[in-house]
Each structure stands twice: as C-alpha cells, then as structure tokens.
C-alpha cells in the first residue's frame, strides 16, 4: 500500500528509501505481524493480499460458507472470488471490507493530520469495493482527524481501469516543466 504524495505541485521523494510508504503506518497496535517486522501495519489489513488471507481464513474456518460454494479450495481464493461473494451478499466478506475501510480511514486521518487538507484517491483492485470501502473509511477519518481538516479533504476512488499513476506522472511533468495545469 503506497501513496504518491504531491505537495505544491512537487512529488515528495523523501529519503533514499522513498516516501509514501503508508502501508507501514500502524493502524492496529495489537494486529498481525507485517513482513517489515512491525505489527498492525496498514499493509496487514488493506492490501489485496491481506484481504485474500483474511477471507481465506474465514472460508477455512467455515467449510459450509458461501465462499466455499464459490471456490472448493480456499487456497485458490482470489480477489475476483471475493467480489463474487460480496455480490452474493456474504456478510463475512462485507465485514472484512468494512474493517479494511476503517483501517484506511485511520491511515487517512494520520495523513490529513500531518499534511493538512488533501485529496485521497483509492486505486487498484480494492477500488472495486466502492462505497462499501469508502463509507467506513470516511467515517473513521472524520472521527479521528480534526473536523476542519476532514471537511476540507476529499476521499474518492478511481475507476479500476484507470491509468491514474501514469496520468499523475504526466500531470506533474506538464506542471513542472511547462507550467501547464
């Protein structure tokens, strides 16, 4: 889970390791151990890999669940199967996505607290969860950050097919080199 942070038209580069590694913001101090060695990182809750792991654990814990009807082997579970389970009304999957939104909301509240009002755009496979992800994200952000900052901030989702990363890079070049935008 990464972020492209743009401040006054300039991409924040940070240290040689980089900037925008929001996947390693702690959102659950008592949470699972992350690959980075810390506990409760956003990455352990909100990455597509962690969503698959969490839903897989639910399927393994209940072999008669609707998820098991969609995939016979929980180890073969993928995001597409999770979307199908969600469309079928699976409440366990709905809860996983709600928790994912809440974790993103905690991270967003931290970003808003540090950077001030900002635009936060969700992109990638999790963007397909739409309002089911955004609503708990916004609610959590609003509960955890200064109201004046959250009112001035925007949270949204890009279409899954969007080339937002390429478009953002092109916009930075146009702005920085040509003064356009």
Language-model features and meaning:
Residues 11, 29-33, 38-181:
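ATP-binding/phosphotransfer module of carbohydrate and carboxylate kinases, centering on a glycine-rich
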